[in-house]
Structures are given as structure tokens and as C-alpha cells.
Amino acid sequence: MDIRLALVGLVHGGLLAVGILLAVIDARTHRLPNRIVLPTLFLLLLVAAADAVATADAAALGRGLLGALVLGGFYAALRLLSRAGMGGGDVKLALVIGLVLAWHGWGAFLLGASSAFALGAVYALVLLAAGRADRRTRIAFGPWMIAGAVLGVLGG
């Protein structure tokens, strides 16, 4: 079996399992626990590094690290600029998602990152139109980040 294929499968399976867990937790509690997000980031960094060693090609690792910094930085800026907007868990999850999406390529990164905001906006508009939310209603964003990441991986 090709080592790269095995590592990609490990990343996809792990991200999907952890993503579902985090989406459920965030939807219920508006929290993305450090005890899940941070070990996930560490393990994905190890897998990306193993991929770089196994393939003798560090380009995907470098792209993944840059993607983590860019998306994490963007979410951190949103957190600083909006008082009740993004939570700290969203910022840390953005590091994980940025790493995985950019590891796959910039197309996956752009599609996944933008899809999260589009999906979250549509959901918020539906809630507003149905009278189930107002401008002050807090909406968990983690599920939309994860859904966007899945779309990015599948479509990017």
C-alpha cells in the first residue's frame, strides 16, 4: 500500500471522526474543548511531517503550516475585532482546518474556508427568517467550519 494514500486516509478518517464529535459538542454547548482540538492539531502535524519524510517532499507540509497560520490568524483577527463573534475554540479549530485544507492544496483551502462562512450565513438567515433567532443570538460556528472543511477536501 502506498504510504501517502494511507496517511491521507488517516487524516480524512481522523478529521471526520473528530469533526463530527466537535460539531455535536459545539452545537450543544458553544464550546470546542482544548482537550480535543489541541491533540488533534498535534497529531495532524505529525502526520503531515511523516508525509513529508515518506514522500521526500516538504511542499505539502510547508503549505499546511502556512494554511494553519493564515486561517488561524484570520479567525484570531475576527475574534479581536468582534466582541461576541468568534470564540477561542473557533480560532484553534481554524489552525487544524487550515493545516488540513492547505496540505491538500490552495484550492481546497479557499473552498473550505469560504464555504464555512457561506454555510453559516445561510443557516443564520434561515433562523432569522423563521423567527428563531435575532441579531444577538449566538450561533455555534464550529459545525460550519467542519462542514466547510469537508467540502474543501472533497471539492478542492
Task: Label each PLM-derived region with a short phrase.
Residues 1-156:
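A membrane-topology feature that recognizes alpha-helical transmembrane segments
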